[in-house]
Amino acid sequence: MEETRTFSTRDATNVHTSFRKAGNRMSAWAALLAAGLLEVGWALGLKYSDGLTRFWPTAATVIAIALSFGLMALALRSLPFGTAYAVWTGIGAVGSILVGMLLYSEPTDPFRIVCLALIVAGMVGLKLNSPV
């Protein structure tokens, strides 16, 4: 005889919890992406601050650093430390190099492009292998 099972409030709680956890993971990765982009911003701000001697670029740099660190801290609540840190610095490195190529005519030779692609591939691999 086939047993019928009813949907209980406990089942609803479990479904809600799993969706909330998925949302936290997505939020953590979004926070990490934003933190990495802000890292590019504060690195660029350092260039424009002229050795921290110009007020507004320096202020913008300090704000970007604080926001980047704050978002990284939020991401670390859910993501593994090593993965999060590697992705954060990778976004900053790749973004900074791309900004240098686009804004400051830094070299765009094929070897540099391959190296950037390897950094991105490493970050994607870490993300795909992350338990969260």
Residue positions per predicted region:
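Polytopic alpha-helical membrane proteins, predominantly small-molecule transporters/carriers
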Residues: E2-V132
